């Protein structure tokens, strides 16, 4: 898997890009392809349920539920079957630093960084091939933001997922394998130099 960055200032087209790849909007021109098929030719409901997970800047968690319940609901909605669901969820949350005592707190009681980690686990457990994160460090302090980007990098490389970070932050883009810079709604590709990847 690889981690990609979509880098752009406000108004550059990042939100439109997110709407297009998630199937919330249709392209007026051209087409978006997934596994050699246009998104217009496949069931968008199935695509979003089985292949794409989005981590929103505002986390989009159910604040009246616990961290554990938030992840459990995502697993059920996705239809992913796990042998020992309880252990799978508990271990997935622990792997990002959400201890068992935190797992049983309502997410509204967790810090911003903890909520973002829960949102990342919600995306991970769905089995989606592609995880898109919208401004993943927008509401976080610098250190927590760095931890979240490292977590996405680990997901991309260890779990062989495609991770797409949509951001205005050049430092985040530098951590990605490939960056596409959006300027005036046009993509400009920047690949890491070999010396940077070692």
Residue ranges and their predicted role:
Residues 22:
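Helix-to-loop junction immediately C-terminal to a conserved catalytic motif
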Residues 30-38:
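Conserved ABC transporter NBD signature motif
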Residues 39-53:
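ABC ATPase NBD coupling module
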Residues 65-73:
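Short coil-to-helix segment of the ABC ATPase nucleotide-binding domain corresponding to the Q-loop/switch region
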Residues 83-101:
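Conserved ABC ATPase "signature" region
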Residues 106-110, 114-116:
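Conserved ABC ATPase signature
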Residues 127:
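Conserved catalytic motifs of ABC-family nucleotide-binding domains
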